[in-house]
Curated annotation (Swiss-Prot):
The keyword Nucleotide-binding applies. GTP binds at residues 15-23, 36, 148-150. This is GTPase IMAP family member GIMD1. It comes from the Eukaryota. Belongs to the TRAFAC class TrmE-Era-EngA-EngB-Septin-like GTPase superfamily. AIG1/Toc34/Toc159-like paraseptin GTPase family. IAN subfamily. It comes from Homo sapiens (Human). InterPro entries: G_AIG1 (IPR006703), GIMA/IAN/Toc (IPR045058), P-loop_NTPase (IPR027417). Transmembrane segments: none annotated. It holds the Pfam family AIG1. Residues 6-217 form the AIG1-type G domain. GO terms for molecular function: GTP binding.
Length: 217
């Protein structure tokens, strides 16, 4: 029986090598579950699931205070420096079915560095994988998480100005996913403050989608 005082949200991270997926996953979990480091090659080679502690009184739903638990699936970079596209895609497909086959996926987060232009085949490869794995309704279950957003401030840009000057490819994608995006900053904010801000934004997306989930076989 579902506990009305608790809610679990299931998230999956997608993105290119060195986009900051594992680091973003650790912020979402409030832990260091995922190995994250700078390297000239892909670091993550297999999917892994992390679970956060309960965030008590995170939100109110139906007049009740609800504790939130976050489950995050970290995936290998795509394209990968050592693994074939076919292998990575199959690995992620099996992980989605294993971890979210019954509970379902609330949101796929496309992790994209804010200081890397969104253009060319490499940046669209992860989007294509999301489309193939999530199916025709992928737009309703996908958001963009921009990492290294402090680079935007360093360049003297606001978030709105940054998006206004973005590539047509990024603008088209944002239109497709109903402008679901969130920025992650490394400087000037505590990890907990970042985490809460990002989770609040993610919960807005999930609520707008009526708490629906995608299930996998």
């Amino acid at each position: 029986m579902t506990d009305p005082n608790k809610m679990i949200i299931n998230l999956a991270l997608f993105g290119m090598t060195q986009s900051g997926k594992s680091s973003a996953g650790n912020i979402l979990l409030g832990s260091t579950d995922f190995h994250s480091s700078f390297a000239p090659c892909s670091v993550t080679t297999c999917c892994s699931l992390g679970r956060s502690c309960h965030l008590h009184s995170f939100m109110r739903r139906g007049g009740l205070e609800v504790a939130l638990q976050v489950q995050v699936l970290d995936t290998p970079g795509y394209p990968h420096s050592r693994l074939s596209k076919k292998y990575v895609k199959q690995e992620v497909k099996e992980a989605l079915a294993h971890h979210f086959g019954q509970g379902g996926l609330h949101l796929a987060l496309l992790v994209q560095r804010a200081d890397v232009p969104f253009c060319g085949q490499e940046v669209t490869d992860p989007v294509q994988m999301i489309q193939e794995l999530l199916g025709h309704a992928w737009m309703n279950y996908t958001a963009i998480l921009f990492t290294h957003a402090e680079k935007i401030e360093e360049a003297g840009l606001t978030e709105d100005k940054y998006l206004h000057e973005a590539s047509d490819t990024l603008k088209t994608l944002l239109n497709s996913i109903q402008h679901k995006y969130v920025f992650q900053y490394k400087k000037g904010k505590s990890l907990n403050e970042q985490r809460m801000k990002i989770l609040e934004r993610i919960m807005e997306f999930i609520k707008e989608n009526c708490y629906q989930v995608l299930t996998f076989k």
